[in-house]
Amino acid sequence: MPKPILLICDDEEGIRESFKLILEDQYDLKFAHNGVDALEQLKSINPKAMLLDIKMPKVHGMEILKQIKKSNPSLPVIIVTGYQSVEMAQEAIKNGASDYIPKPFESKQILKAIAAVTK
């Protein structure tokens, strides 16, 4: 049986590598380096969930979240970001995020969040 697809959108290579180490055994990982790339990839893949950073070049992650929720409202999007404010978390949830995980994160946080939205 093929692995479920996860789309990971983060501009930091080190973070993408961390996700790869944590998730590659269980998921078919697709990576986007910015929001424009993520939106383009979503035209051709159907991920089970998405991990999305907020602070990125070209298009802010919150804008990407809004666009994704307009075109694919059922796609679970987990925000993983360096922003640790309650206000930012509330805005993300209000805009359709399934979960909000501040960086730095632990492996178990990521695995638990993905498991919760992909049941």
Feature locations, PLM:
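Short amphipathic alpha-helix used as the core "switch/output" element in two-component signaling
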Residues: 40, 62-72, 91
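Acidic catalytic/metal-coordinating carboxylates
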Residues: 34-37, 60-63, 84
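Two-component/phosphorelay signaling modules centered on CheY-like receiver
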Residues: 13-30
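C-terminal output helix
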Residues: 87, 105-115
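Acidic, metal-coordinating helix/loop segments flanking the phosphotransfer/catalytic sites
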Residues: 31-49
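Receiver (REC) domain active-site loop signature in two-component systems and cognate sites
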Residues: 56
